Amino acid sequence: PDELPTTLSTLMAKAMNDQSIPPGEGILHHAEGIDLIPANIELAGLEVSLVNCMNREKMLKQVLEGAKHDYDFILLDCTPSLGMLTVNALAADTTLIPVQAQYLSAKGLEQLLQTVQKVRRQINPKLKIEGILLTMTDSRTNYGQQIDNLIRGAYGSKIKVFDQTIPRSVRAAEISAVG
């Protein structure tokens, strides 16, 4: 993504500078039918600029506006933080909350849910939580089972916790290192 002429940070910078974004700009089309807008480390730097931007909570929505009618779903993969980019992603219609099956991630879930409530009150009252998806699970260990039970027990009565989980995979870690 570092060599690509257009990334998500390029598009968001255009939106922040009130420049038009042609529909489809920056979208890469994969042969398997999945399209994506790549991002790179520049996006983290752009987040600092968002703080001083008017309508800063909706810049990402503005970027995606021209393309949203071409898709049934647009998935936004956010970093595990509660910064301005995550708030921008919460301008979506719905959110699916992935949570690593680890203690600190489970603790961070409460903060994220508080942020979602604040976004509902102040920015996007229609935001719906689709559910919680447990990731990096390892049902073979007591610890993995305890975290699974902890999240289901604490949130399962209020928010759907999907039965399907994404297991821990060494292969996934290897692939992410390649890019």
Could you describe each region identified by the protein language model?
Residues P1-G179:
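P-loop NTP-binding core
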